[in-house]
A protein has these predicted regions:
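Surface-exposed, extracytoplasmic segments of Gram-negative outer-membrane nutrient-acquisition systems
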Residues: 29, 205-213, 250-273, 308-384, ...
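Extracellular/periplasmic, surface-exposed regions of secreted and cell-surface proteins
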Residues: 1-21, 30-334, 391, 395-398, ...
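Generic secondary-structure boundary signal with a strong preference for alpha-helix termini
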Residues: 23, 80, 193, 358-360, ...
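Short, surface-exposed loop/turn motifs at beta-strand boundaries within globular domains
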Residues: 44, 384-386
Length: 472
């Protein structure tokens, strides 16, 4: 029959936030206390309308049709006030500050419309086909590039329903499935990436001023992906269900920040550039360990392995912060100086540096330097874990549920920016220090883990390097 369904959702979030830095110690000491207050409002509404029609042909053929429309709207507003200089740490109000620093506000709007359709077909509840298509329009992109059309086709074969499989009693269900299609991505940190943006309230020489914040990109459009999946779903022994799936996703026109030449006056601009591939295997298992009238215990386990590589890029390589973008490597590849330890003679920090010939070409050998800016940057591994997953156990007794979840990830690198601040050898003032800083070089402790501690140090020993890069 025909079913027409309409739904509307409205989410409203209101948040007041205060950040207080005490004038007596820590980061607030240098400015006699710092107070920031935020008032944030986030409103999201979604309207969805779908029309379904299902029918059968000759009893064995089943067809389902769906057509739909969706409208999405989000409004985000924020008011921020910031001040320093508090003579009394007990009276934490902006009006008590001697130096009102800044007041800012903003309001962001995002809209999206979608039209979509799907056809499902099955024969004898054993052979299934599905085709879907959707067209999405997003306010994030420039006029003329706002709409993207994406589709997918998939099928599965329920092997356990075949006559030749009926005798295998320990297999409850076995299904082989595969799909291929395209998808789009609009997510980035830029709601208005195609527009030039300006910031008011920037005074210069006592006069009001406006700052040009963002260069426009009127060619900005959807990030597009091609997705292939193949997997097996199974149920065995009446108590264990699971799936094993291989996926391969290739993406083009990635939404990335493109660094710009300093002469432009901008650091970067959101652009469509390069290609990337993600492929891997995902395994999900669900077991019913105990199932009685009053007591049930189930376990869910999953693990995923993902390999990420940049497949194309308009430049040979591009450094973005502590990462590097280059073909053949992960987009999460760390690129920075490699820590070589401490000079036992004088306590200087050391980093590795390539030895070069008289033409400036690397010879393949390395030496060390105590000058951070002279040290060579190296590719030092990806932030992407080799595997991620989770384990959940759920126990139910007479209607009372108890569960605990454990998530994990191993492999990959993590950069500890907090350690950079708290193990700084005197390079940063106003920070507390961690206990590892006690093992600093002295004439009596020449095999120390950390360089000589010098208050108001300027040797950049805490510069971003593999000193703070750890295995996850």
């Amino acid at each position: 029959g025909v079913h027409w369904r309409n739904s509307f959702s409205y989410d409203y979030t209101n948040m007041d936030e205060m950040r207080w830095y005490n004038p007596e110690h820590g980061n607030g000491a240098a400015v006699d206390g710092r107070l920031s207050k935020y008032a944030i409002s986030d409103i999201t509404s979604t309207f969805t309308s779908t029309l379904n029609y299902a029918f059968s042909l000759f009893n064995d053929h089943h067809i389902g049709l769906l057509a739909g429309y969706e409208a999405y709207k989000n409004t985000y507003s924020m008011l921020h006030a910031h001040a320093t200089g508090f003579s009394n740490s007990e009276m934490i109000e902006l009006s008590m500050a001697s130096t009102p620093y800044e007041t800012k506000s903003k309001k962001d709007h995002e809209r999206m419309q979608s039209f979509f359709g799907r056809i499902n077909y099955d024969y004898l509840n054993k052979y299934f086909l599905s085709f879907s298509i959707r067209t999405d329009g997003s306010s994030r992109f420039a006029p003329g590039h706002r709409w993207g059309t994406f589709w997918s086709i998939g099928g599965n074969w329920r092997i356990s329903e075949e006559n030749f499989f009926k005798g295998i009693e320990w297999v409850d269900d076995l299904k082989l499935r595969a799909s291929y299609g395209t998808s789009g991505n609009k997510q980035s940190d830029y709601l208005y990436g195609f527009q030039g943006l300006y910031d008011t309230g920037n005074n210069y020489n006592g006069q009001n001023g406006i700052t040009h914040l963002q260069i426009p990109n009127d060619e900005l459009s959807w990030e597009k992906s091609k997705n292939f999946n193949v997997g097996i779903d199974f149920g065995i022994f009446g108590c264990l269900n699971g799936s094993i799936e291989y996926y391969n996703k290739t993406s083009d026109a990635l939404l990335l920040e493109k660094p710009l030449a300093p002469s432009t006056g901008f650091e970067n601009a959101i652009s469509n550039l390069g290609g990337m591939r993600n492929q891997g295997i995902e395994i999900d298992l669900h077991s019913t360990n105990i199932n009685t009238k009053d007591f049930t215990w189930t376990t869910d386990f999953n693990i995923a392995f993902n390999n990420n590589k940049i497949t194309s890029y308009p430049q040979k390589e591009e450094v973005v912060g502590t990462k590097i973008r280059t073909v053949g490597y992960s987009i999460y590849e760390f690129y920075m100086q490699e820590w070589a330890g401490v000079d036992p003679v004088n306590g200087d920090p050391l980093w590795y540096m390539d030895v070069t010939d008289d033409k400036g070409n690397p010879t393949g050998e390395r030496t060390t330097t105590n000058t951070y800016s002279k040290a060579t940057k190296y590719k030092l591994g990806s932030a992407l874990p080799s595997a991620t997953g989770g384990l959940t156990n759920t126990v139910s007794w007479k209607g009372v549920d108890f569960s605990f979840m454990f998530t994990y990830g191993f492999g990959g690198k993590i950069y500890d920016v907090y350690e950079e601040n708290l193990l700084n050898d005197g390079n940063k003032t106003g920070y507390q220090l961690i206990t590892e800083q006690a093992d600093s070089w002295t004439p009596e402790n020449t095999n120390a883990s950390n360089p000589k501690f010098i208050p108001n140090n300027s040797n950049t020993s805490n510069g971003r390097s593999s000193r703070y890069l750890h295995n996850a």
